């Protein structure tokens, strides 16, 4: 119904903003990710999602269209409401959420406040196929220019480890410690394989 709002930024906090658009102040709920991307300029544009309930019409704002799409995907899961979806986007980067869903990383999703094991599993079960198809992700590892990760992976293959299993372990290590050296990735992977 309302695709985006463009106007003068009147108020800004980590959870919401007010945008003056031709004399009307729109209150939008935002994630911490969006908060970190909102420029300090006077005029801004946020992509929106309007949630209509019996007792309220609530606007959610996003700097990036991709974050809005992930928000909508999360809302499609039974047991995930707007506040939990917003908490997820505040706790993890949108790319991290997609990666966790694509790789079936229940632990990462479960680490978000308000999400238990069953809900995390449901998120993965309901969204994995959509995420892999729509966002064109490889099921095991998303494309990354991390040469340390690639070299560590090839070293583990030379040592005789299963490629898919090694990829999962190396991907997890690289996600937790993006600046890890080849040696530290291999050492940690050997402990986990």
Regions found by a protein language model. Give the residues of each.
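Residue-level recognition of specific faces of alpha-helices
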Residues: 1, 70-76, 85-88, 100, ...
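Structure-specific DNA junction-binding interface
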Residues: 1-76, 181-193
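Amphipathic, charged-and-aliphatic alpha-helical interface segments
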Residues: 57-62, 82-101, 122-135
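Conserved, well-folded catalytic cores of nucleic-acid-processing
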Residues: 77, 91, 103-104, 130-137, ...
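Small-residue helix-packing motif on alpha-helices
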Residues: 85, 97, 120, 166-169, ...
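Strongly charged, low-complexity linkers/loops
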Residues: 123-173
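C-terminal, charged interaction/regulatory segments at domain termini
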Residues: 161, 167-193
């Amino acid at each position: 119904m309302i695709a985006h709002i463009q106007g003068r930024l009147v108020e800004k906090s980590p959870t919401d903003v007010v945008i003056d658009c031709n004399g009307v102040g729109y209150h939008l709920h935002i994630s911490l990710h969006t908060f970190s991307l909102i420029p300090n300029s006077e005029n801004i544009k946020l992509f929106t999602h309007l949630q209509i309930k019996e007792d309220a019409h609530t606007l959610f704002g996003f700097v990036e269209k991709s974050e809005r799409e992930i928000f909508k995907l999360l809302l499609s899961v039974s047991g995930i409401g707007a506040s939990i979806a917003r908490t997820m986007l505040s706790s993890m980067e949108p790319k991290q959420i997609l990666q966790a869903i694509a790789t079936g990383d229940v632990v990462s999703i479960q680490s978000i406040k308000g999400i238990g094991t069953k809900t995390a599993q449901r998120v993965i079960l309901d969204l994995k196929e959509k995420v892999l198809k729509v966002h064109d992700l490889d099921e095991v590892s998303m494309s990354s220019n991390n040469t340390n990760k690639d070299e560590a992976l090839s070293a583990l293959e030379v040592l005789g480890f299963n490629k898919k299993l090694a990829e999962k372990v190396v991907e997890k290590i690289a996600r937790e410690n993006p600046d890890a050296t080849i040696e530290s990735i291999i050492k940690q992977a050997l402990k986990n394989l």
